[in-house]
Amino acid sequence: MLRSVVLAGGGTAGHVEPALAVADALRATDSRVRLTLLGTATGLEARLVPARGHELATVPKVPMPRRPTPAVFKLPARFLDAICQAGETLDLVRADVVVGFGGYVSAPAYLAARRRGIPIVVHEANPLPGLANRLGARLTPFVATSYPSTPLRGATLTGIPLRGEILTLDRSPAAMRAARARYGLDPHRPTLLVFGGSQGARSLNQVMTAAAHPLAAAGIQVLHATGPKNFDEVAAALPLDLPTPYELRPYLDHIPSAYAAADMTLCRSGAMTCAELAAAGLPAVYVPLPHGNGEQRRNALPTVEAGGGLLVDDAELSASWLLENALPVLISAERLAKMSAACAGSGHPQAAAAIVAMIRDAAATRRRSRPRHAAP
């Protein structure tokens, strides 16, 4: 019987939200299972985990220095401390399985679990795995990925686990009208949702201030989350005489409601964003981050290739590009419907259930191989 599961994932929404989705799915299938989310005291999980009704345990954040600095010499001791603290949590909650989602806390959790003979499950949300999950995948046969191209040997393709609010999102005409009214928008106008992640995206903001008037002239209204640091700048640059509603917010406190209000989205292409939009059947213009290893472009490709979105490089995005490529979709109910159907078909709505099944399979291997909580 599965009694206690530790889910390690913290720092960013891309690590925290999948962990929470799996925790919710485990709770729904068996309320007796003890669920502990392992994170840091300063990441998003410090706010999100308690808000979702789950227990949070923390370990020190041990980032890998990107260039040689004196901090490199402190890394081994700090990492060992994180492993010890993760191990204390595993002992305290008598963990049957450790599930890691990458990020700062997963590597210490994997090593602490390995030392104790606790089965490990790894979930990788991105096309290219990070260091922590490359390590974790070497320690277990229970590896789940979100993309078929992810280079982790022996992995099972599950997709990204999503919260129930996204999977059951109602985007019927009546629900869309109600969602728009809650944001002070016209219930009947085509609606573009713009957001750039939790901190916003300056290039998206700049394009929207330039495109606001021609979009409004075409009958399009906008719900735009600028990011808290960018709000005043965007508000000052936005035209005042727009003929259609333009609802400007520093952030969106309930993203499912924003998805329900929108016909199309202009956004970055983080793994969670792409998975949520696919599940919601919401077409998007994806603008990958212009730096990093190109993973945001890879995140968006399955949906774009299926016909559920448009893809444009950050350097190529402009008001004229938006008007030439996105506006014709926004004003065509037929094109929106086709893209929505294609978008929804590119997702993995059973991801959380598949990972729960993998967790139970992992727990069963320990029961067969050794007494529960026997010393390694």
UniProtKB/Swiss-Prot annotation:
Pathway: Cell wall biogenesis; peptidoglycan biosynthesis. GO terms for biological process: carbohydrate metabolic process; cell division; cell wall organization; lipid glycosylation; peptidoglycan biosynthetic process; regulation of cell shape. Signal peptide: none annotated. The keyword Cell wall biogenesis/degradation applies. Keywords: Cell cycle, Cell division, Cell membrane, Cell shape, Cell wall biogenesis/degradation, Glycosyltransferase, Membrane, Peptidoglycan synthesis, Transferase. GO terms for molecular function: UDP-N-acetyl-D-glucosamine:N-acetylmuramoyl-L-alanyl-D-glutamyl-meso-2,6-diaminopimelyl-D-alanyl-D-alanine-diphosphoundecaprenol 4-beta-N-acetylglucosaminlytransferase activity; undecaprenyldiphospho-muramoylpentapeptide beta-N-acetylglucosaminyltransferase activity. It is an enzyme of class 2 (transferase). It catalyses: di-trans,octa-cis-undecaprenyl diphospho-N-acetyl-alpha-D-muramoyl-L-alanyl-D-glutamyl-meso-2,6-diaminopimeloyl-D-alanyl-D-alanine + UDP-N-acetyl-alpha-D-glucosamine = di-trans,octa-cis-undecaprenyl diphospho-[N-acetyl-alpha-D-glucosaminyl-(1->4)]-N-acetyl-alpha-D-muramoyl-L-alanyl-D-glutamyl-meso-2,6-diaminopimeloyl-D-alanyl-D-alanine + UDP + H(+). Cell wall formation. Catalyzes the transfer of a GlcNAc subunit on undecaprenyl-pyrophosphoryl-MurNAc-pentapeptide (lipid intermediate I) to form undecaprenyl-pyrophosphoryl-MurNAc-(pentapeptide)GlcNAc (lipid intermediate II). This is UDP-N-acetylglucosamine--N-acetylmuramyl-(pentapeptide) pyrophosphoryl-undecaprenol N-acetylglucosamine transferase. It comes from Frankia casuarinae (strain DSM 45818 / CECT 9043 / HFP020203 / CcI3). The lineage of its organism: Bacteria, Bacillati, Actinomycetota, Actinomycetes, Frankiales. The gene is murG.
